[in-house]
Amino acid sequence: MKTALRCCHDLRRIAVLISLIVPCYNEEASLPFLYEALCDVRKSDTGDRNYEFIFVNDGSRDKTADVIRELAANDKGVKYIFFSRNFGKEAAMYAGMEKAKGDYIAIMDADMQDPPSLIPEMIKDLDSGEYDIVAARRVTRKGEPKIRSWFARRFYKLINRMCDVEIADGARDFRLMKREVVDAILSVNERQRFSKGIFAWVGFRTKWVEHENVERVAGETKWSFWKLFKYAIDGIVAFTIAPLRIATYMGFFFSFAGFAYMLYYFIKAIVLQIWTDDYVRGYPSLLCFILFIGGLILMCLGLIGEYIGRIYIESKGRPIYITSEESKD
């Protein structure tokens, strides 16, 4: 009986497949370096494991597609998905997870800012059975603009105060996950996705692997300050209604303040019968107050619009992405 169980266990080990998902957008210069590093990881694996590399071309305008096709032609372990246009990194990660067949699935950037050298350690941690996810976290932001680093840290503090889930400061999308974790993530089929929040929301036992910030091996970042700002807004709107509550609290506060101000002048004018020319001298302050309240109202309407807009987008039920070409399994 023990021998039979041992044989079954060995068969499960042989069947282990590791899927490495790489979203790509204009990464023709980086892909050869990344592919070489991934091949080194595959060669150095002494366990009974198979690997598949899944490249998701997110509507690149350079020769990224040609590079991927060439890799796939020379390596049966290379799979790919080409989008019909640029749908964004979130859609690319979702598409890669849908295509992945592995028992362990990893997501990593094509620019090698996610060190492939961490993958063997991640595999070892998952093999231990103590964790379901092994995720990478930057402990420094060396090489990153200071203003960008400052806003990033403020964002993590803000969203963690507002949300019920905690998103680690410096957390990357780079992580190795068991199949059941990926299945849980895929069940969250939102159109406007914020994966860092989804990773935290689904839960599971997570180990963090810390590393120093690594600069891009080639090319330029696709994330401008404005794109990061919009991404931050998407994250906040996707995982908390705190902004709406803040707008409600501000409404109560200014309503009370306005009532108190009105009561003050009522008592002064009617009860105490103190008449002055404040109505002339107070005109600038009144105008500033009206402009301030008007701006506050517009801001609150904008917040409401963000949430209603999300409902509208989700209600249309459009696909998260559309493919133009896909490798055969």
Name what the model sees in each region.
Residues 85, 110-112, 190, 211, ...:
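Short, conserved catalytic or interaction motifs in soluble domains
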Residues 50-51, 134-135, 167-170, 194, ...:
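Short, hydrophobic secondary-structure boundary micro-motifs
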Residues 10-144:
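Structured catalytic core of nucleotide-sugar glycosyltransferases
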Residues 11-15, 196-329:
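Hydrophobic helical membrane-anchoring modules
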Residues 20, 38, 96, 111, ...:
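Residue-level signature of catalytic and energy-coupling elements of molecular machines
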Residues 70, 83-85, 89-99, 104, ...:
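Acceptor/aglycone-binding surface of glycosyltransferases and processive sugar-polymer synthases
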Residues 2-3:
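Polybasic, lysine-rich low-complexity intrinsically disordered segments
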